[in-house]
Regions:
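Nucleotide-sugar donor-binding patch of glycosyltransferase catalytic domains
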Residues: 18-20, 24-28, 59-131
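Intrinsically disordered, low-complexity segments enriched in serine/threonine/proline/glycine
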Residues: 133-135
Length: 135
């Protein structure tokens, strides 16, 4: 099962993802408290997503993360808690800009490919960093 978690602001995007992913997906964005989100994430095999509260919750409850990072701040500054995570981040000429709005259409994030994320996820699963018996 694929699950989207997040706040109320993530509900519409979560619904787009749920539709794209098909019947094995659930959109729980905007429906759960932080404690509820942590419990759902604790039951997951892995978290795949960007640097958000959900990523930090996943790391705190021991769920391995494929964490997608922009290059706006310093490497390692906001990575998920604990060991056994895969961090995807690409350096660009504007790395360390600290800008909230990117004038280059999020170039550093767009350099991260779906294939790259899938390879990282498979590496987590194969390495045994995943939790067994979880969805």
């Amino acid at each position: 099962m694929l699950v989207v978690v997040g706040g109320r602001d993530d509900t519409a995007r979560g619904e787009e993802l749920r539709r794209a992913w098909g019947p094995r997906a659930r959109n729980l964005a905007g429906e759960l408290s932080p404690y509820g989100s942590a419990e759902v994430l604790r039951q997951c095999v892995a978290y795949v997503g960007n640097d958000t509260g959900a990523m930090h919750l996943a790391g705190m409850v021991g769920t391995p993360c494929v964490a997608l990072f922009s290059a706006r701040d310093y490497p390692g500054q906001w990575e998920p808690y604990g060991d056994g995570h895969e961090v995807l981040r690409h350096e660009t000429d504007c790395a360390g800009c600290m800008l909230d709005v990117c004038p280059y259409n999020n170039k550093c994030l767009n350099l991260i490919t779906v294939d790259e994320a899938m390879v990282s996820l498979k590496r987590l699963v194969v390495s045994g960093n995943r939790k067994t018996g979880r969805s």
